[in-house]
């Protein structure tokens, strides 16, 4: 029972942390967001240059960040549902997690409408939704892999 409660608490805290990260990024003004993206882009380009790769464009980095943060959300949502509703079949958990992720993407873009120097883009909602789906699939596949390696997982 204690292990189940700990897993539920941890999964909920993970979801809340990912949401806080996503929404706090969206609340940044356009100038602050650009400065942060430029700093990350400089670091990524240094690493790529050291590995013999070419530079990454700002728009590509921003889109990759959108996808990655929503992939983390998708993984955390499906994990939370597996912990909180273990009796609910995955075929029912999946649409619930995905819908929650898509609503989060719409909310995220809505926040940006009210952030100075930012705008909302429908294409970002689509990209974020794809990230949610990818994160969910990765989490489910990872769990299946763990079960094959260790039947108690």
Describe these PLM feature segments:
Residues 148-153:
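Short, charged juxtamembrane terminal tails flanking transmembrane helices
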Residues 105-129:
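Interfacial helix-loop-helix junctions of multi-pass membrane proteins
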Residues 69-84, 132-146:
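Membrane-interfacial alpha-helical segments at the cytosolic side of multi-pass membrane proteins
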Residues 86-99:
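Internal alpha-helical transmembrane segments of multi-pass membrane proteins
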Residues 18-25, 101-108, 136:
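Alpha-helical transmembrane segments of multi-pass membrane proteins
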Residues 2-77:
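"…centered on the first transmembrane helix and the immediately adjacent amphipathic helix/loop
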């Amino acid at each position: 029972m204690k292990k189940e409660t700990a897993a539920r608490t941890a999964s909920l805290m993970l979801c809340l942390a990912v949401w806080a990260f996503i929404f706090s990024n969206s609340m940044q003004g356009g100038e602050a967001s650009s400065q942060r993206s430029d700093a990350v882009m400089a670091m990524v380009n240094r690493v790529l240059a050291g590995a013999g790769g070419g530079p990454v464009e700002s728009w590509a980095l921003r889109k990759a960040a959108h996808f990655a943060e929503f992939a983390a959300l998708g993984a955390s949502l499906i994990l939370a549902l597996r912990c909180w509703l273990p009796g609910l079949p995955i075929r029912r958990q999946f649409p619930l997690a995905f819908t929650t992720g898509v609503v989060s993407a719409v909310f995220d873009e809505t926040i940006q409408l009210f952030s100075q120097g930012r705008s909302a883009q429908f294409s970002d909602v689509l990209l974020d939704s794809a990230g949610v789906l990818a994160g969910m699939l990765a989490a489910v596949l990872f769990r299946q892999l763990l079960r094959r390696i260790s039947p108690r997982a």
